[in-house]
Amino acid sequence: MIDRDGFRANVGLILCNQDDRVLWARRAREKAWQFPQGGVKESETTEEAAYRELEEEVGLGVEHVKIIGCTRSWLRYRLPNRYVRYGNKPLCIGQKQIWYLFRFVGEEQDVQLNLTDKPEFDYWCWVNYWYPLREIVYFKRKVYQRALNELAPLIFPDHQSLPPARSNYRKRRRQKTRSRI
């Protein structure tokens, strides 16, 4: 669904384990990392879309997760011009997202990335709640910051884990050896 302003309705999914670490997944074709996300169909609510996308992208059903909360309103980002398909009608210039925070209550082996013919992701790991802000592609960074900051009090009631508000996180190089992040 693309609205009259050119934004595609979408859900973003933050899956948090019992240690308050979040599922971070590597896209199969681009080798970029991100949270699972996906479009909202005309016939479904954002909550229904969130559950459907969880199952399609990481193989988790309602028995594996519990909704903790979601953002109060749509969070928008514009696509860089090189990603806009100007020949498509209606024209999509970006995404508007409702973000859901889920508690993972399943087992590690329940995460299945290969349930579709074209999997979205080829690898996943648990990372610190704030880690994605340093690693996400630049044009999604502000939306990630807003979603993580809005949802953080639901799992960090004392707010001690909130980072200082900064709109421009510096890009960091990936280390060649991977340690627990």
Swiss-Prot record:
PROSITE patterns found in the cross-reference section? NUDIX (PS51462), NUDIX_BOX (PS00893)
UniProt cross-references to Gene3D superfamilies, sorted A to Z? Nucleoside Triphosphate Pyrophosphohydrolase (3.90.79.10)
Q: Which UniProt keywords apply?
A: Hydrolase
Cofactor(s) listed: a divalent metal cation
The record, for SUPFAM superfamilies, names:
Nudix (SSF55811)
- From the Swiss-Prot or TrEMBL record, what is one GO molecular function term? pyrophosphatase activity
EC identifiers of the protein: 3.6.1.-
Instruction: Indicate which residues form the motif Nudix box.
Output: 38-59
Q: Which InterPro entries match?
A: Nudix_hydrolase, NUDIX_hydrolase-like_dom_sf, NUDIX_hydrolase_CS, NUDIX_hydrolase_dom, RppH
Q: Name one Pfam family in it.
A: NUDIX
Nudix hydrolase domain residues are 6-149
Q: Which family does it belong to?
A: Belongs to the Nudix hydrolase family. RppH subfamily.
NCBIfam families with a match to the protein in the record = PRK00714.1-4 (NF001937), PRK00714.1-5 (NF001938)
What does the UniProt function comment say about this protein? Answer: Accelerates the degradation of transcripts by removing pyrophosphate from the 5'-end of triphosphorylated RNA, leading to a more labile monophosphorylated state that can stimulate subsequent ribonuclease cleavage.
Q: What is the designated name of this protein?
A: RNA pyrophosphohydrolase
- Give the organism, scientific name: Nitrosococcus oceani (strain ATCC 19707 / BCRC 17464 / JCM 30415 / NCIMB 11848 / C-107)
